[in-house]
């Protein structure tokens, strides 16, 4: 949830379209930014920030998940407090009672879901996984590379598993769904529910709407990459997978 800015827009899109999506909960996990592991609390805080901006904190729960890889955790799966147990147990509990096939929409690495299938394989017929990931036919995709062992395990099960691919540089993947900061600055200010009490953004500042926070995320993204020439547009990988 705390990676760059497409995660936040995917979550907001889901929560804004309640006529189409019945969002019951979210799980988060850590990723690596290429240098070091990210902080699970920062992912949780950013997810909660978006939920609050969309005024859904009373109906959507967030659960902390894995901080390691599937391979590193799997042997501890029978321990009551294994790494990621809160998120994994939530997935299992919801899948067990779902009257229809429960859709899991991971827009990051697959660790939490793979652990849930390992711990309770009986939920496999009850779920449908729609994952934003893979750069097939080519290698090198962030969500896949963050935990290839989780992907491998899921592929070896009989889970209903769909991939929404990135396909860098191609028109046939989510990399083609791009937006410029100029478009964001024109369209997004004030969009979404308006909060009476503003919240603090991850880069500082206070915000009463997701639209204003969206502008801030893009402005900080532009600042972060200014030495590389500030890319004119940014793919919204995760939001494209949701849509």
Segments predicted by a language model, with ranges:
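N-terminal acidic, glycine/proline-rich low-complexity segments
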Residues: 1-243
């Amino acid at each position: 949830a705390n990676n760059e800015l497409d995660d936040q827009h995917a979550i907001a899109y889901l929560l804004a379209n309640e006529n189409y999506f019945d969002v019951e909960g979210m799980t988060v996990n850590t990723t690596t930014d290429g240098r070091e592991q990210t902080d699970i609390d920062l992912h949780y805080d950013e997810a909660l920030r978006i939920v609050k901006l969309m005024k859904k904190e009373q109906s959507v729960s967030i659960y902390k998940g894995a901080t390691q890889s599937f391979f590193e955790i799997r042997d501890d799966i029978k321990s009551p407090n294994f790494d990621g147990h809160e998120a994994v147990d939530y997935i299992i509990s919801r899948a067990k009672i779902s009257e229809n096939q429960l859709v899991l929409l991971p827009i990051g690495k697959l660790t939490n879901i793979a652990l849930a299938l390992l711990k309770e394989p009986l939920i496999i017929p009850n779920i449908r996984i729609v994952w934003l990931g893979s750069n097939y036919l080519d290698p090198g995709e962030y969500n896949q590379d963050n935990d290839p062992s989780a992907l491998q395990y899921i592929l070896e099960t009989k889970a209903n598993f769909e991939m929404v691919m990135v396909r860098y540089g191609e028109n046939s993947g989510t990399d083609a769904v791009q937006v410029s900061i100029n478009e964001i600055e024109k369209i997004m200010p004030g969009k979404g529910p308006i909060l009476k009490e503003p919240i603090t953004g991850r880069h500082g500042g206070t915000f009463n709407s997701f639209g204003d926070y969206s502008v801030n995320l893009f402005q900080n993204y532009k600042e972060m990459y200014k030495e590389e020439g500030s890319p004119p547009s940014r793919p919204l990988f995760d939001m494209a997978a949701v849509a």
